[in-house]
Amino acid sequence: MSNQIKLLVGLANPGLEYKRTRHNAGAWVVEELARIHNIPMREEAKFFGLTGRIQTNGQDLRLLIPTTFMNLSGKAIASIAKFYQIKPEEILVAHDELDLPPGVAKFKKGGGHGGHNGLRDTISKLANTKEFYRLRIGIGHPGHKDKVAGFVLGKAPTKEQELIDAAVDESTRCLDILLKDGLSKAQNRLHTFKAE
């Protein structure tokens, strides 16, 4: 059974200084999809972000990269969801994931925020529902929680970045499977992928 996902969000911090930092990995998924479909992402003040729209597998899919800071992402997501009457379970949020290594990505439905401020605010602004889909892009972990802030706001070394980029590419391919054939088939493919 297919999933009626109507909104894909890529979490990020705004500004050039953050563009290639690990915390912006979610936005790279949306940027890659927009590039593949050759559509521009436009600033939309009422949605506090960059928006676009693509057609994939006969479905309309709205794209959003919030231009709020990460910890205010929910404001942008809630605004566009309310305007287009998109339910939480029709939203897929792509985000960086400390608990997965670079080169790995996983789909998930529901769950907590795992300390991710973008997810925390999204859950809060969607009336505390956790039932949206997530696309977790592995960035690895610095080894100690005290180093996390500097790590996520830093740029990955070239080899790690290549692994993350490969996982982003595979994620965009598996998104088509998610939309067409459902979560378990998309998970079966994406969860066996590991960039080397």
From Swiss-Prot:
Residue intervals passing through the bilayer: none
UniProt superkingdom: Bacteria
Recorded coiled-coil stretches: none
Main location: cytoplasm
Similarity comment text for this entry: Belongs to the PTH family.
Annotated HAMAP family: Pept_tRNA_hydro_bact
Binding sites annotated in the UniProt record for tRNA: 18, 69, 71, 117
Sites marked Discriminates between blocked and unblocked aminoacyl-tRNA: 13
Biological process terms in GO annotation: protein quality control for misfolded or incompletely synthesized proteins; rescue of stalled ribosome
Enzyme class: hydrolase
Active site per the UniProt annotation: 23
GO MF annotations in UniProt: peptidyl-tRNA hydrolase activity; tRNA binding
E.C. number(s) listed in UniProt: 3.1.1.29
Subcellular location: Cytoplasm
Catalytic activity: an N-acyl-L-alpha-aminoacyl-tRNA + H2O = an N-acyl-L-amino acid + a tRNA + H(+)
PROSITE patterns: PEPT_TRNA_HYDROL_1, PEPT_TRNA_HYDROL_2
Subunit structure: Monomer.
Organism: Aliivibrio salmonicida (strain LFI1238)
Function of the molecule: Hydrolyzes ribosome-free peptidyl-tRNAs (with 1 or more amino acids incorporated), which drop off the ribosome during protein synthesis, or as a result of ribosome stalling.
Keywords: Cytoplasm, Hydrolase, RNA-binding, tRNA-binding
Gene Ontology cellular component list: cytoplasm
Record keyword Metal-binding present: no
Identification of the protein by name: Peptidyl-tRNA hydrolase
